[in-house]
Amino acid sequence: MMKYKVIALVGKAGAGKDSLLDEVLTGNLGKYDLHEIVSYTTREPRQGEIDGFSYHFVDKYTFADMVHDGRMLEYTKFNSWMYGTALDSLSTEKTNIGVFNPAGIISLMNRPDIDLYVIYITATDKERLIRQLTREENPDVREILRRYDADEDDFYLFEQHTIRKLVHFTRIENGDHTFYDALDALEKTLDKIV
């Protein structure tokens, strides 16, 4: 059976997952030769997001067809939007890296064709809130609060139960004034995995 090597970054909203991923891919793509996993979603693009780069933006019918046809490795619903990772988003020749939520991690854990390495990015609530409020010109405060509430439930179960079942697990703190320390820790972890 063919196995896909997947490095999954996971963390609450505003923890810095995407920023760390961008730094690793842009600064060290040649060093690690990583394949970035681009997920699918049915939501509208946010300011600055590009189809095929940030996400594959598809309508709900296309997404439903992909689920029905067994092309999705994992998927989940947030509000009325669907998010997921398709099998065709993975490379068999390179180590794959992407951002996942706790439900996605659980789905990947249960797949025999995935060799999973989880890196949990954490930050204080204050730091996360500051990042989310300053990320966009006109942030949707209600959406930020909704994501905070959802994270409390999702990550409680993840922290209490899922982490114990992971074979390959690393926690990295990306708090106040520690971005480059977190990046350094991430690179050291990647050196061991890749």
Where are these regions (language model features)?
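Conserved phosphate-donor/acceptor-positioning beta-strand/loop module used by diverse small-molecule
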Residues: I97-N101, R111-L133
